[in-house]
Design a protein with these regions (language model features):
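An alpha-helical, amphipathic repeat domain used for nucleic-acid recognition
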Residues: 1-165
Length: 165
């Protein structure tokens, strides 16, 4: 435990621990939830400092957990946007996204495969798939590579069946 003194208001200590025991959250989100309970700004500031010093409130951990949770559905752009909306500092966002960068293509392929079972047969379907993936926060480069990989996998699966004709 840290040397930071516990806030004098016992109610805010109890409320803080209850909130943070449920799930991780950013400083901004934590302060907003405490403010909704009508605590004074001074008590909220003291609680934030105390929780950070004792390791209850950790924005880097929050960013990692949130990115992992959202990573199955969304790309780096959307994850970064969500983290910034929650008040996570840019440094923590960049650090988290750089750790996830290697798996971006695999995640895009999984999302593409879950939503669209078949490769696009015309330009309209291709544009629809690209738009869908862009709204999910994947970059055009990653989308293009994921679609090429899916098309190559589909062609490889289809070749033996076509040869039997």
């Amino acid at each position: 435990l840290s040397q930071t003194p516990k806030p004098a208001n016992r109610e805010i200590v109890s409320a803080s621990l209850r909130l943070l025991a449920m799930r991780d959250m950013s400083r901004m989100e934590f302060a907003r939830k405490l403010a909704a309970k009508a605590f004074t700004p001074e008590d909220i500031a003291a609680a934030v400092v105390w929780c950070e010093a004792d390791g209850w409130l950790n924005e880097t951990r929050y960013a990692e957990v949130t990115a992992r949770r959202l990573g199955h559905k969304y790309g780096a752009t959307r994850i970064a946007q969500t983290l910034k909306q929650k008040g996570v500092p840019n440094g923590a966002v960049a650090e988290t996204l750089s750790a996830m960068k290697d798996g971006e293509l695999a995640r895009a392929q999984a999302v593409l495969e879950r939503k669209f079972r078949d490769a696009p047969s015309n330009a309209e379907q291709r544009a629809k798939q690209i738009r869908y993936m862009q709204t999910r926060g994947f970059s055009f480069d990653v989308i293009k590579r994921a679609m090429c990989a899916a098309a190559a996998a589909g062609a490889a699966l289809a070749e033996p069946f076509e040869a039997d004709d």
